[in-house]
């Protein structure tokens, strides 16, 4: 046996570790499916102008990405995306929502929508901050 250190995060190594962790986790936690969720604002041709992606998992809506093109910012599109995702999450039985954002992205946006900051990574990756939020739906 030996340790191998690499800076080549190849897909096989990542999948091996992910598979082992997933098997371990499934043997010890209550059953719940990760169900993808996506809300999109599109132009007439189906081109994406804004969107939110994530998943619902048990009691939680986990927001992975929320983006609004610069030309549409400040027009309520992000708020509508978030509201639609939260409404769908409640329909799916979720009680809470989780999101994270960098200090240069949208911390005030989430606070404005009732999210409470629960943790901040300082100096991330060097001089910024990464904020973590939750909200009771």
Language-model features: where?
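Conserved N-terminal entry element of GNAT/NAT acetyltransferase domains
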Residues: 1-9
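Conserved active-site tyrosine of GNAT-family acetyltransferases
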Residues: 17, 110, 115
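A conserved beta-strand-loop-helix scaffold within acyl/acetyltransferase catalytic domains
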Residues: 32, 43-45, 52-61, 66-69
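Short hydrophobic/aromatic beta-strand element in the GNAT-like acyltransferase core
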Residues: 36-40, 51, 65, 130-132
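A structural microfeature
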Residues: 49-50, 119
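Conserved acetyl-CoA-binding loop-helix of GNAT-fold acetyltransferases
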Residues: 74-87, 112
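Conserved GNAT acetyl-CoA-binding A-motif
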Residues: 89-102
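Conserved catalytic-core motifs of GNAT/GCN5-like acyltransferases
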Residues: 98-100, 116-132
């Amino acid at each position: 046996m030996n340790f191998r250190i690499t800076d080549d995060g190849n897909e096989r190594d990542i999948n091996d570790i992910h598979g082992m962790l997933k098997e371990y986790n499934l043997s010890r936690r209550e059953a719940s499916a990760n169900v993808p969720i996506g809300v999109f604002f599109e132009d007439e041709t189906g081109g994406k102008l804004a969107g939110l992606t994530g998943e619902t998992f048990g009691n939680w809506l986990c927001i992975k990405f929320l983006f609004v093109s610069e030309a549409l910012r400040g027009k309520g599109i992000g708020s509508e995306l978030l509201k639609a995702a939260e409404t769908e999450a409640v329909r799916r039985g979720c009680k809470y929502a989780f999101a994270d954002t960098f200090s240069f992205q949208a911390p005030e946006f989430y606070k404005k929508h009732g999210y409470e900051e629960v943790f901040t990574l300082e100096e991330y990756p060097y001089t910024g901050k990464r904020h973590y939020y939750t909200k009771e739906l």
